[in-house]
Amino acid sequence: MKRALALGFLFAFLPAAHADLAAGKRKAEACAACHGADGNAAIPQFPVLAGQTARYLYLQLKDFKEGRRSEPAMAPMVTKLSTQDMLDLAEYFAAQKPKPIAFKADAARVARGRKKADEVLCTMCHLGGFSGQNEIPRVAGQRPEYVIKQLKAFKARTRTNDAGSMTSVAQTISERDIEDLAHYISSLD
């Protein structure tokens, strides 16, 4: 019995199928209105998915589907996605190249944001250049509006699908820090 439970637990975290990029591209057509056909969102409130880590994308889709992460625009999009669909979409968007965003960062805010990022040790998880790894997102080059929205959600504890790490960090930063961090992160590519 214990062995069966252990094996069941192990296999619950392993995707059963391999991702299909061509299928992901076809499925991504439904995502284009908000995220762009290639994952380079033109709408400031939506994240750039291009170049994001596949593991992170898969987990976010799963969290949206299972109600651990909430976003009204995403709810109807994920309800019918299968595990295979989520794997295909995650791999497709991860394989795309992020394009520089049209954003003129304020130099003073970038400097303050860099200092705050060092203080709260952002690169311990997000890595140098904020490139992300595995289930930690690539945040470099995200639009400032999206970065601000997410940091505020972590601070308000309305986004909690992070195992507590971002929620804890967000409690230590001010509204000004959030704006400064957004300028810094959005200035990276």
Please annotate each region the language model reported.
Residues L14-A19:
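Sec/Tat signal peptide C-region and signal peptidase I cleavage site
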Residues G39-R69, A75-L81, R114, D118, ...:
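Gly/Gly-Pro-rich "capping" loops immediately C-terminal to redox-active cysteine motifs
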Residues T79-I101, E145, Q171-D189:
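C-terminal capping alpha-helices of c-type cytochrome domains
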Residues D20-D38, I101, A105-G128, R143:
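Sequence/structural segment immediately N-terminal to covalent heme-attachment motifs in c-type
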